[in-house]
Curated annotation (Swiss-Prot):
Compartment(s) where it occurs, according to its Swiss-Prot or TrEMBL record: Plastid, Chloroplast
GO molecular function terms listed in the Swiss-Prot or TrEMBL record: rRNA binding; structural constituent of ribosome
Organism: Spinacia oleracea (Spinach)
Lineage start: Eukaryota, Viridiplantae, Streptophyta, Embryophyta, Tracheophyta
Stored NCBIfam families: rplS_bact (TIGR01024)
Family to which the UniProt record says this protein belongs: Belongs to the bacterial ribosomal protein bL19 family.
Transit peptide: 1-77
Chief location bin: plastid
PANTHER family: LARGE RIBOSOMAL SUBUNIT PROTEIN BL19CY-RELATED (PTHR15680:SF10), RIBOSOMAL PROTEIN L19 (PTHR15680)
Keyword entries, A-Z: Chloroplast, Plastid, Ribonucleoprotein, Ribosomal protein, RNA-binding, rRNA-binding, Transit peptide
Record's function text: Component of the chloroplast ribosome (chloro-ribosome), a dedicated translation machinery responsible for the synthesis of chloroplast genome-encoded proteins, including proteins of the transcription and translation machinery and components of the photosynthetic apparatus.
Protein name per its UniProtKB record: Large ribosomal subunit protein bL19c
Amino acid sequence: MASKVLPQALLVIPSNHSLQCPPLKKQLGFPIDSNRRFSLSSNCRSNLMVSRASSNLFSSNFSSIFSFPARNSFVVRSEAEDSSDAPAESVAVVAEEELPVESEAEAEERPPRQQRVKLGDIMGILNKKAVHAAEELRPVPGIRTGDIVQIRLEVPENKRRLSVYKGIVISRQNAGIHTTIRIRRIIAGVGVEIVFPLYSPNIKEIKVVSHRKVRKARLYYLRDKLPRLSTFK
């Protein structure tokens, strides 16, 4: 380590041949004769020559150590860049050509996405199917509030005999297959109300006797009115 640092320190000394060592009179404090001065000057020149030679050797060694790998690295980089230019372009072109083909293939292979069916939608579908099947067995007329209807009902407890009920429809509750109507009539001066499932299999026939126009959807106010308003011919 000291051998490498010493030439760097010696490089600071100027390389002028006419330069002589500084007088040592001031440094030493006593006079020096010419022979000694000449010998000192020759010694200084020899030291300068040695320092110059050592500096040249150090610079040559330094350049040989550090410049050779730099040149090699530069050459390697240039070759890598030159060699990677053409394949990069070809790879980019191939990728651009393959992308549309893959996207089209994926679009063709993917099946259409099915929408999620909620529980309410399922119940609605089942109600529609049940209503359609019941109407095929027995057609149901359009019944509105205020109509006078006649219903022929089969009673299982009465040896399946048919009973006829007639009255005014005071309300209708729509609930799919569970739709019901409420009929009111006067029996022995007393108001009687009966609820019938509209799509019940026990109902064999429903007949609309007459239509009446009313303003309200539910005629519950007839309960507080006179019995003659709930009678019909």
